[in-house]
Curated annotation (Swiss-Prot):
Transmembrane regions: 71-91, 92-112
Function of the protein: Participates in tumor necrosis factor-alpha (TNF)-induced cell death. May be a target of Wnt/beta-catenin signaling in the liver.
Localization of this protein: Lysosome membrane; Cytoplasm, Perinuclear region
Subunit structure: Interacts with BRI3BP. Interacts with MGAT1 and IFITM3.
Domain of life: Eukaryota
Keywords annotated in UniProt: Cytoplasm, Lysosome, Membrane, Transmembrane, Transmembrane helix
Gene: Bri3
Protein name stated in the entry: Membrane protein BRI3
The species this protein was found in: Rattus norvegicus
Family per similarity comment: Belongs to the BRI3 family.
GO CC terms, sorted: lysosomal membrane; perinuclear region of cytoplasm
Molecular functions per Gene Ontology: identical protein binding
Topological type in the membrane: Multi-pass membrane protein
InterPro entries: BRI3
Length: 125
């Protein structure tokens, strides 16, 4: 059974002009972006006589500071030799207080730490 669609069942044509069909806007121009007004006419200049002063351009220069590209800052690096990385070490007094005042002595032990460079041996408090 070949069933051909009737004329009423076919979809509408795609070549509808503006203002036709189901999705047409209301009155013409409603919702459209208004066009810009034409630019004002330019005044006529008389040739041969300069009408304006010559233009002067000001050029400002800025001082640019350049930093060396090979300076690498290591966090925790030794400020004396700039090679070693500082390590924490506990003082003898801090270890003694940690043993004698057992639970609370650890606070004293961590409060009395020093930073030491393994490369040059410098000690920082």
């Amino acid at each position: 059974m070949d069933h051909k669609p009737l004329l009423q069942e076919r979809p509408p044509a795609y070549n509808l002009e503006a203002g036709q069909g189901d999705y047409a806007c209301g009155p013409h121009g409603y919702g459209a972006i208004p066009t810009a007004p034409p630019p004002p006419p330019y005044p006529y200049l008389v040739t041969g006589i300069p009408t304006s002063h010559p233009r002067v351009y000001n050029i400002h220069s800025r001082a640019v500071t350049r930093y060396p590209a090979n300076s690498i800052v290591v966090v925790g690096g030794c400020p004396v030799c700039r090679v070693g990385v500082l390590e924490y070490c506990f003082t003898c007094l801090g270890i003694f207080l940690a043993i004698v005042l057992f639970p609370f002595g650890f606070l004293c032990c961590f409060a009395l730490r020093k930073r030491r460079c393994p490369n040059c041996g410098a000690v920082f408090t």
